From Swiss-Prot:
Protein name: Putative uncharacterized protein YCR049C
Chain residue ranges for the region called Disordered: 65-85
Stretches with biased composition (Low complexity): 65-79
Further facts: Almost completely overlaps ARE1.
Source superkingdom: Eukaryota
Length: 148
């Protein structure tokens, strides 16, 4: 996920279709937590609905980018590898596999947005479909989670 400075806070999200703002809001929260907690922290989007927030875990060691998180019989995982190749451990408990999935979906959506900004108009429809799939899968993964 991008760790660059966010474009800003923006206004409140008024529509789930406002994907650009959703990702900008996500990046803002990630950057804010990095600035106020620790620059070595790895953040993961853990929000309700479209109100974004970040859960942060300290990066403890290096690993290859394609490492696989270790999942126990309950379906939870304690190791997560971000796109910079840093493994992060949850110091307060376990990270659920669904959060790892959300993290990857958002990274895919952000990449699609970058392509969208640099593409011709004929490709924009295709990228819009990719975004719809990403956020549709994200919504579906949330719906499958049992209430806390």
């Amino acid at each position: 996920m991008a760790l660059s400075r966010s474009v800003g806070r923006g206004s409140k999200l008024t529509s789930p279709k406002n994907d650009t703002y959703l990702l900008a809001s996500f990046r803002w929260n990630l950057d804010r937590d990095l600035l106020f907690r620790c620059e070595r922290y790895f953040c993961m989007w853990a929000s309700t609905g479209y109100s974004s927030s970040c859960s942060c875990f300290p990066a403890t060691r290096s690993a290859s980018v394609d490492s696989t998180p270790s999942v126990d019989s309950t379906g939870s995982t304690s190791d997560v590898v971000d796109d910079r190749g840093e493994t992060s451990m949850d110091s307060c408990g376990r990270i659920t596999l669904s959060y790892v999935t959300e993290c990857r979906l958002l990274a895919s959506a952000e990449l699609s947005l970058r392509i969208l900004r640099n593409s011709s108009s004929c490709n924009k429809s295709l990228v819009s479909v990719i975004l719809a799939i990403c956020f549709g899968a994200l919504a579906a993964s949330r719906a499958e989670q049992p209430p806390a």
